[in-house]
């Protein structure tokens, strides 16, 4: 996320196990010990706020299974697994709230799909190829030990936020 939005300054995360009992491959029920949903809010340097929600129990009524929503003062973006939609500040509808009549605004209308400029390969494959080239040919590799440590730190602080039900500030690693 640092490479797209900037450094993460804070996080609130709530995880949940919405389906406590599952059925295994043999048709036998078992108690689930894994969370099946994560709801997170991130604050980035510069004031950008992003909401990442992921759930295996969602009945999808959005563009994709995973949706990342990022708001800024000049516009917003909604990103799925394949597509990105943006809405500039100037295209944002200005509704008047009136619960007595149907809403006349189609809020999806003012969004613009970001055009695909190139074909993308499988992301996991591409990262492995970059890593193997780094190991064999000593080519640059942007995801070093510090980047890994920042990822572990964010995951641990996300779990702490969930456990304490509170906003957590992210300290800088050195």
Annotate each PLM feature:
Residues 36:
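Short, small/polar residue-rich loop motifs at catalytic or cofactor-binding pockets
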Residues 51-55:
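Conserved metal-binding segment of the jelly-roll/cupin
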Residues 128, 152-155:
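Short amphipathic alpha-helical/adjacent loop interface patches that line ligand
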Residues 154-164:
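Short arginine-rich
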């Amino acid at each position: 996320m640092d490479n797209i939005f900037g450094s993460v300054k804070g996080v609130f995360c709530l995880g949940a196990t919405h389906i406590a009992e599952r059925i295994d491959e043999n048709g036998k029920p078992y108690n689930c010990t894994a969370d099946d949903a994560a709801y997170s809010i991130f604050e980035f340097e510069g004031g950008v706020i992003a909401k990442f929600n992921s759930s295996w129990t969602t009945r999808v009524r959005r563009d994709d299974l995973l949706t990342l929503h990022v708001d800024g003062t000049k516009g917003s973006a909604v990103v799925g697994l394949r597509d990105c939609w943006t809405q500039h500040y100037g295209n944002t509808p200005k509704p008047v709230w009136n619960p007595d009549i149907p809403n006349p605004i189609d809020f999806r209308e003012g969004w613009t799909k970001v055009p695909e400029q190139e074909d993308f390969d499988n992301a996991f494959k591409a990262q492995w190829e970059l890593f193997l080239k780094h190991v064999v040919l000593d080519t640059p590799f942007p995801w070093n030990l510090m980047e890994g440590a920042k990822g572990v730190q964010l995951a641990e602080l996300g779990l702490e936020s969930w456990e304490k039900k509170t906003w957590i500030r992210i300290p800088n690693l050195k």
